[in-house]
């Protein structure tokens, strides 16, 4: 309700309103659409269900399938744009990249009127980070973006600000 109210207040000032929110019901997404939200982002984090459950041992985020199907519910509710992505580095990056591509392709095929985008964030080393990661190098990220562009030529690709400016500047031409 809070997000819908914020969108209603913002709608007169912006031509498009996007949200990156927790998994909701289709009715809740429809309430957001009715309030003026037209773009939705949901990071699955990883498509490896066993790993996902290990990373989320309790709480509302634990329901893997509910989260996995959130973009579908958002599209059914009327979102004009849906953005999905996995956090590269939680699992083997090629596996999550593959399933992210399949997920985006399925949404695109099921909802041809919805614009699809894929985000490509990578785990980056930082103080306090856990050690059980599967690093994806800059070279791996380039390979992923090229594969996405070949497989889903009309799909938007979002780069993370986690990437070095030098890297972002060079990746723009690929996506």
Where are each of the predicted segments found?
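Local sequence-structure signature of Cys/Sec-based thiol-disulfide redox active-site neighborhoods
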Residues: 134-135
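Core AdoMet radical
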Residues: 1-74, 80-83, 112-119
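Conserved C-terminal portion of the radical SAM core fold
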Residues: 38-39, 44, 65-129, 138-163
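C-terminal hydrophobic structural anchor segments
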Residues: 166-175
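Short, internal active-site loops enriched in acidic
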Residues: 23-26, 124-125, 164-167
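Non-catalytic positions within long, well-ordered alpha-helices that form the structural scaffold/packing
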Residues: 33, 75, 105, 172-173
